[in-house]
Structure formats: C-alpha cells, structure tokens
Amino acid sequence: MTDFSPREIVSELDRFIVGQHDAKRAVSIALRNRWRRLQLEGSLREEVLPKNILMIGPTGVGKTEIARRLAKLAGAPFIKVEATKFTEVGYVGRDVEQIIRDLVEVAISQVREKKRKDVEARAQIAAEERVLDALVGANSSATTRDSFRKKLRAGELNDKEIEVETQSTGGGSPMFEIPGMPGAQMGAISLGDIFGKMGGRTKTRRLTVEDSHELLVNEEADKLLDSDQLVQEAINAVENNGIVFLDEIDKICVRDGRSGGEVSREGVQRDLLPLIEGTTVSTKHGAVKTDHILFIASGAFHIAKPSDLLPELQGRLPIRVELSALTRDDMRRILTEPEASLIKQYVALLQTEGVTLEITDEAIDALADVAVAVNSSVENIGARRLQTVMERVLDEISFTAPDRDGETIQVDAAYVQKHVGDLAKNADLSRFIL
C-alpha cells in the first residue's frame, strides 16, 4: 500500500494527465484515507468505511486514464472493469461477484511476486543446481560441477540447450461445472486444481540455459513459499486495500419511460448494491468481505443522468467529481506535456526507421485547432480525437519512412492544413473520416 501524501499522488498523476484537478484531488484523498485507516486502533478501524467516488465527465477527458495510473501508484490490489460486461444473477453471463474473485486473483499474483523477491537468493541457488544437473548429471564429481558452475556464472553456457523438468501449469486440464454453485466461473472446477497437489504433473522442455533461468527461479521460489499463508495475505490485502474501478456505469442506467431490454440493466445495479455496501463473497480461496473495498465509478452520462441510477446506488457513491470538457489549451498541452505524449510517441516510432521528425509549435497549434473544431462540429470524443488527427497528418510520413532513412522531416502548420484542413471544414466528410 502506497504511503504517498495526496499532494504527491496529484503531482504523480500530473505527469501523465492534463487538467482535471478536482478528480485527481478526490482520488488522492481517497487513496490516502486507505493508509490513514490502517493506522487506527482495531475497533475504530472497522467502523471507518471508504467514501466511494462517482466521476462524471464526457468521453476522452481522462477518467479511465486516472484509473490506470492510480493502479500503478496504489501498490494495492486494483481492478478495472466495465459495468456493461455484467448481467443480473440468473441471466447468462458474468455476475458482479466475479469482480471480487478477479480482484483476489490480482492480489494473489501481487503477493506472490513480492514474496518471490524475498526468497530469490535461495531460489537462484536451487535453480543453478538444476541447470548443472541437466548439464553434467546429478552424479557428476564436485570438480566437474565447479568448473561448469564458473562457466555458467560467466555466461559462457547461455546458448547451450538443456532439457529440464518443469511443473505443468494445468492449462489444458478439462473443466466441468458443478450445478448450483454460486457464480458460473467459480463453479467451473479444473481437474488440474483437484489433482495438482497430488504429485503434480511435470513435463520435459528443451530450452537454452538463458531461457530456462527465469522459469526455474520462479518454480524454485514457489516451492519455498507457503501457499496457504500467501492466499491469506492476498485476501487480507483485498479486504483492507482493494480498489475497484467501475467504468461505463452510465450504460447500466434505466432511462425514464424506457422498458424492454432494461430489466437486466437495473438488475446489475441491484446486484452492485450489496457489493458496494459490504457483503461476503465466496471465492475458491475462501470468503472475502467487501466492506472496506473502495469503489470508484465513472461514466460519461451523455444520455442518462446520474439521477437515473437507483437512489440506493447514488447514496453509496457519496463523493461526486465532475470532469470538465477539454479546451483548445488542454488539447495543446496533451500533445506536448505528458511523459509519453502523442508527439513523443510518434517521434520515437519514426526514429526506429532513422527518420527525425520535427513538429513546430505552429503545427501543434494547428493540430489542437483541428481537433477542437471537429469535436464541436461532429461528436465530442475528447482527447481521443487527437489520435485520429495525428494519424491522418502523419499517414504519408509513416508509409514512406522505411525509404527515407537519415532524413529530417519538419511538420509545420501548412503541412497540417494541407492534410486535414479541408476535412475539418467539411462536417460531412469529417463525420466519416475524422
């Protein structure tokens, strides 16, 4: 769990996302409150519930990007799901409890990675012994092993092929469903899970010494880990630090005066209620309480309104944050400021072909102008419009780049106007092309 202060979290998000200060503040405070709660005494800690967030804003302004960056920052079990993927219990499809099961799997992977680092030194030694066994045999003399060990550590044997016995992951195990078990995905039991612990199937693989190293180190590290303790730690991390980002929540709103296909939409909202309020979800690793999991919901609310959500669901998302539509100045900053801005990406991509791309300040202004003009005349899709415009402008350069090795190409305002200016002016054309 990260112990960044809200100010540090906001400045970290600023490196990748332009504007939207209110949304960044809200998620940074929510994330810091997770840490604050863990510093409290036992009885009070149970009483402090997370303040769930609803982010409202047009498409392409940074809602999903905030979630993605937050996931990397959080150092906590984090999952991003689209609300539209789920159906009401009883309908064919995934029920919302699957969110928590997936979150547990994410946490187990995180904890396993962390614990592998703790036993890495011992695992390296064990993996080295297995490679030596494959190279010179288990019964070889100490002198032979030592001479091969020196060569192995010096990297002289990296390209040599060896045969190693590895644990089969059970990926091909047949699955069968147990009727009546909660959640179809949970009910699908793999025979590999049942028989995996009884001897565990192994298979022989032929690999180079270099390729086998990581595989064997991970396998030896897993042997040194206590799987029951690992699962318990993961469940504890989910219950106390877990974060669920629910995207596209506006798509499961039931709009006034509409019926028909809306039944399962409202059903999904009803199923989300206990999950957000706090319930116990059964997973194959054990029961998980959702009382202290933080839920961040987001939606564009183009057609539906936040008030179209079930009143109970609105009450369980007490913090409302509105993200503003992007201005021309924002568009210009998006092209240049973030660490992996669009312009930096295109320059780096063309550099691989030996082409140096230079985009002038006037060209950046022109790109921002075109994106804003098309957004206002056709459909406002926010910053995503910049990708479309950039692709059109650099289409010719990208196509001919392999033949222009060593060239320096300058893109100015006139070049931008030549390639997309007419399209931007003609709303009918831009409707189909931009």
Curated annotation (Swiss-Prot):
Keyword vocabulary terms for this entry: ATP-binding, Chaperone, Cytoplasm, Nucleotide-binding, Stress response
Compartment(s) of residence: Cytoplasm
One example of a Gene Ontology biological process annotation: proteolysis involved in protein catabolic process
Record InterPro entries: AAA+_ATPase, ATP-dep_Clp_protease_ClpX, ATPase_AAA_core, Clp_ATPase_C, HslU, P-loop_NTPase
Cellular component annotations (GO), alphabetically ordered: HslUV protease complex
Gene3D superfamilies to which the protein is assigned, alphabetical: 1.10.8.60, DNA helicase RuvA subunit, C-terminal domain, P-loop containing nucleotide triphosphate hydrolases
NCBIfam families the UniProt entry points to: hslU (TIGR00390), PRK05201.1 (NF003544)
PANTHER family: ATP-DEPENDENT CLP PROTEASE ATP-BINDING SUBUNIT CLPX-LIKE, MITOCHONDRIAL-RELATED, ATP-DEPENDENT PROTEASE ATPASE SUBUNIT HSLU
Family: Belongs to the ClpX chaperone family. HslU subfamily.
Protein's job: ATPase subunit of a proteasome-like degradation complex; this subunit has chaperone activity. The binding of ATP and its subsequent hydrolysis by HslU are essential for unfolding of protein substrates subsequently hydrolyzed by HslV. HslU recognizes the N-terminal part of its protein substrates and unfolds these before they are guided to HslV for hydrolysis.
Protein name: ATP-dependent protease ATPase subunit HslU
Taxonomic source organism: Rhodopseudomonas palustris (strain BisB18)
